[in-house]
Amino acid sequence: MTKPAVVTLVLCLALAASAPAQLPDLTGLWGATLRFGPDIHGTLLIYRTPDGWRADIAGFTVPVRGNAPPFAFELPDGKGSFRNGHWIQPGGVASPVTLVADGGGPNRWRGTVTPLENRLTFYLPITRDLHTYLRNPERNAGTFTRVSRIEVNGKDVRLIGPRDTVRGHYEDGVITLPLRGGTYDLTRVSDSATSPFYPRGNPPARYRYTPPLQLDDGWPVATLEDVGISRPAIEQFVQLILDMSMDSLNTLQIHSLLIARHGKLVLEEYFHGFDRNQPHNLRSASKSWTATLIGAAMQAGVPLRLDTPVYQTMLGTVPADLDPRKRAMTLEHLLTMTAGFNCDEDDTTSANEDVMDNRGIEDWWGYTLKVPLVSTPGEKIFYCSTEPHLAGMMLAKVARESQLDLFERLLARPMRMRNYYLGLRDDDAYGGGGWAFTSRDFMKMAQLMVNNGRWNGKQLVSEDWVRRSTAPLRNLNAVQQYGFLWNSAEYDYNGRKIRAYFAGGNGGQVSMGIPELDLVVAFTGGNYNDSVLFTGQRVYVPRYILPAVQ
């Protein structure tokens, strides 16, 4: 080899060695899911032995208290407990368990424990110019970690946003990122065309209306045409949902859409991988269940009244030095969020739900009673989630029965709701939010109100309670009013105003009744902590649903 050839070869090798490594092509959809438990589930057996009652579940055998249902027991290491027909899973969530005689007469009982799954999924859609964002269906955690692009340097990966940077690494087709709850190994979604990241496929098939299934859950079904709703208009609306581009963190995420009229379910559609058997977190829409439960308890004879004093009821005696304004506080003030506590969910300096949670407060109702007042009860409305919780605890105190048992007895059984979960505080249902129901059961709440408190011929809640609960008693904001833990609003319809009331929760949870049209609409969604969550009730109902109703 000649000397010039050698020099040329050396230069080529040097240039090759100094050239940057080729960046991997990350274009496409990436995703990962972490499951956090709970691990106890399956068949529960409770049986009598010569030494007393025992319970078997998931490999554990423990002693049982009680000689007949209701039984009670605890698993070791806080893995769960059972009391009065409810399974209490770690983290404080209760779900009903039906015990049936298991062939051994009264000495053997069988049930099934189905805890609420705790899992988080993150999607990372990456464009050719390396723009991206984090999509999290369960909690919308991307709103707290706002990123807009991805950078790769060798094995180092950075997700970069205006304020946040997430550092991870890439190797062998895996993007590893530390995100909420743990470390996620995101892989390319192999069949992104059918991924739950999209409403229903990418691109979606042309939507054709199909009536809901008739199930043994108390819902009669019919077609849109049967109840005077335009099928073409609703088909066009559902197609709009299916065609939504998922190119932004703020894109609307609708998980379900249901419509009923004249007491019959006529539309039932699910998106983003959700289905009719999957309970959905209702967030603050649970508050309306709390008001409904209190009304049902009054209807059943529990001696609780709107003018029942809060402090006398909860403490037994009123301290001599108690603020006179607190002495005058009643159940009605809690139900209308006019108690006057220094508690506002929009004020991080107040004693609101997030502050109490972050401080690790265990005695929520006791802590709330000690919060100072900033106004006289009945004077101003402050959106405070611990006030409905305190109202629920008043109910339990007066009834001498837990809200868990009251809800199961007074509402769940007569309304045929079997698959639900109630978040707990103070060892009882948390009236401020976090309950989970299937969409069909969630919708029953508004239908019960439209029925003036009747379900399947039985008066569960008085007509007077329905009227007061759904009345526009206070202005919550410029476009919504508030009753007894129920929102209300007005819509234009055929040249006139009609009134609607609804249970509403963060993320886009809506169970709405429009009594003048004998119409009920329900949405569930995943736009937590994002203003687009109001799109269902503020845009879709007046623009697409009401014009379809004849």
PLM feature spans:
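Bacterial N-terminal signal peptides
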Residues: V7-A16
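N-terminal leader/targeting segments and the immediately adjacent pre-domain N-terminus
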Residues: Q22-A32, H41-L45, A94-D275, V302-L304, ...
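Active-site SXXK
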Residues: G263, N281-D307, L334, A391-L395, ...
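Active-site-proximal alpha-helical segments within enzyme catalytic domains
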Residues: A291, E387-M394, G433-W455, Q509-G526
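Active-site-adjacent helix/loop patches that line small-molecule binding or acyl-intermediate pockets
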Residues: P309-L315, D321-M415, S439-G453
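Mid-domain, small-residue-enriched loop/turn segments at the edges of structured enzyme/sensor domains
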Residues: L410-D441
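Active-site Gly/Thr loop motif
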Residues: N419, R467-A522
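Structured C-terminal helix/loop/strand segments within mature extracytoplasmic catalytic/sensor domains
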Residues: A503-Q550
